[in-house]
From Swiss-Prot:
Residues 6-74 form the NAC-A/B domain. Disulfide bonds: none annotated. Residues 65-91 are annotated as: Disordered. Belongs to the NAC-alpha family. This is Nascent polypeptide-associated complex protein. Keywords: Protein transport, RNA-binding, Transport. Pfam families: NAC. Coiled coil: none annotated. The keyword Protein transport applies.
Length: 130
């Protein structure tokens, strides 16, 4: 039935096109899945496939996952922020990017929230979500 065991890849591609399914390989260097319990599942150098079936996008991630605590990942970030900041007192650009991504806000709003929270990522995200 399914699985395409022994099926010609070209024939499989034609069938998928007829059904309105578009498949693309993505060049991902890392995939991070954040779980509700505060852990992250991290895939380094994964094979990522994006399938678009009539507007419904599905991503398939293949690789060797590693679980880590999200708080540990933030602390383990590289200490060399020389390119990320304008001066010693500025908020690192990486922190701003995290708030922008997690809270879906503009960069200037994320930076203001981080400054108001004295650089605390969680507090800044909570602040912009209010």
């Amino acid at each position: 039935m399914f699985g395409g065991g022994g099926m010609n890849p070209r024939k499989m591609q034609q069938m998928m096109e007829q059904m309105g399914i578009d498949v693309d390989e993505l060049d991902a260097t890392e995939v991070v899945i954040s779980l509700d319990d505060g852990t992250e599942v991290v895939f380094s150098d994964p094979d990522v496939t994006k399938m678009d079936a009539r507007g419904q996008e599905t991503y398939q991630v293949l690789g060797d996952p590693v679980e880590r605590d999200a708080a540990d990942a933030i602390e383990a970030a590289p200490a060399d922020d020389s390119d990320d900041t304008d001066d010693d007192d500025a908020i690192p650009q990486g922190d701003v990017d995290i708030v922008v991504q997690r809270a879906s806000v503009p960069e200037d709003e994320a930076r203001e929230a981080l400054e108001a929270a004295d650089g605390d990522l969680a507090a800044a995200i909570d602040h912009v979500d209010e």
